[in-house]
Amino acid sequence: MAKPVQIEVWNPNGKYRVVSTKPMPGTRWINLLIEQDCRVEICTEKKTILSVEDILALIGDKCDGVIGQLTEDWGEVLFSALSRAGGKAFSNMAVGYNNVDVNAANKYGVAVGNTPGVLTETTAELAASLSLAAARRIVEADEFMRAGRYDGWLPNLFVGNLLKGQTVGVIGAGRIGSAYARMMVEGFKMNLIYFDLYQSTRLEKFVTAYGEFLKANGEAPVTWRRASSMDEVLREADVISLHPVLDKTTFHLVNKESLKAMKKDAILINCSRGPVIDEAALVDHLRDNPMFRVGLDVFEDEPYMKPGLADMKNAIIVPHIASASKWTREGMATLAALNVLGKIKGYPVWSDPNRVEPFLDENVSPPAASPSIVNAKALGNA
């Protein structure tokens, strides 16, 4: 028998039982569920990662839906339990769902939700922040000051790289990659080289227009080029930001060989998925190339880092906070809750999961729809 876990209960007499495996930012998501007669149970266990057994205890004998997190293992065991309890939906509070066995969810008829369309800009902002912090060696300088080592100005103290006029490389020019590229091009007047299987016409038009604006005002125009291969980006870019999906073709996309292809003083940024980088190879490269710098928000074996990474002064490492702006995290919680609510109430699936603004306007009621169900087609309700 599963050991009971600590919970906080809202609207105890609600008709539908919805469980959240973690406390989530804001209260709008709770209120939206309560307004539709849901009893909301929030797990308050002091654990960063809940085990399968913990979640089984939360599901119990009757559960209409669960809001969960990327750190949880949602497979055969949990989906079968949720189905037996009468559950109709599970939603990650995340865009990604690598932690979810969608085939198992399909087998038991459980809808799987995610939260795209709300974290594009905030993720791109963090990638841009890491780029600037790495280029100007901000973290090293901060640690230097806090250690009381500053005796006065020196001409060679923490000399970094000027971004203006350099080339930013983007691998994966989807929504986040394109938003990052626009920030770096317009914010720092960098030239762009990008690689994507699909042409990013909108991004190209943006850079072209900005280049024409600069030229008209007597400045050197920025340029763009779509690379024919990822290796081309790695060889030519001064700052490289990774924004691919994670699948078999992108696992260890950056490895020992590709690291060698980069400039000795290049900057590598990853706010996408940890396993796209061979982290052990990266540690070796950082050790052997002290002018090479990296900014990481995600890790190959998260929450763990490969041995030696934390010791690298030329690495900036942050704990998966790309979406950690107040508006974004509250929006993610709202979308996840509405995914579950929509399936409980029998609502249709929203037509465009990347255009979710109508669900996020706090001044109006959200549409009667599930914002994003990744297996809607498989379940026959696309």
Curated annotation (Swiss-Prot):
GO CC terms: peroxisome
EC primary class: oxidoreductase
Superkingdom of the organism of origin: Eukaryota
Entry-linked InterPro entries: D-isomer_2-hydroxyacid_DH (IPR050223), D-isomer_2_OHA_DH_cat_dom (IPR006139), D-isomer_DH_CS (IPR029753), D-isomer_DH_CS1 (IPR029752), D-isomer_DH_NAD-bd (IPR006140), NAD(P)-bd_dom_sf (IPR036291)
Pfam family, any one: 2-Hacid_dh
Keywords tagged on the record: Glycolate pathway, NAD, Oxidoreductase, Peroxisome, Photorespiration
Subcellular location as annotated: Peroxisome
Binding site for NAD(+): R175, I176, C271, S272, R273, D297, H320, I321, A322, S323
First-listed, main subcellular location of the protein, grouped into a coarse class: other
The reaction(s) this protein catalyses: (R)-glycerate + NAD(+) = 3-hydroxypyruvate + NADH + H(+)
One GO molecular-function entry: NAD binding
Assigned EC number: 1.1.1.29
UniProt-annotated catalytic positions: R273, E302, H320 (proton donor)
Induction: The appearance of HPR in the cotyledons of cucumber seedlings is both developmentally and light-regulated possibly at the level of transcription.
Pathway: Photosynthesis; photorespiration; 3-phospho-D-glycerate from glycine: step 3/4
Name of the protein this chain belongs to: Glycerate dehydrogenase
Gene: HPR-A
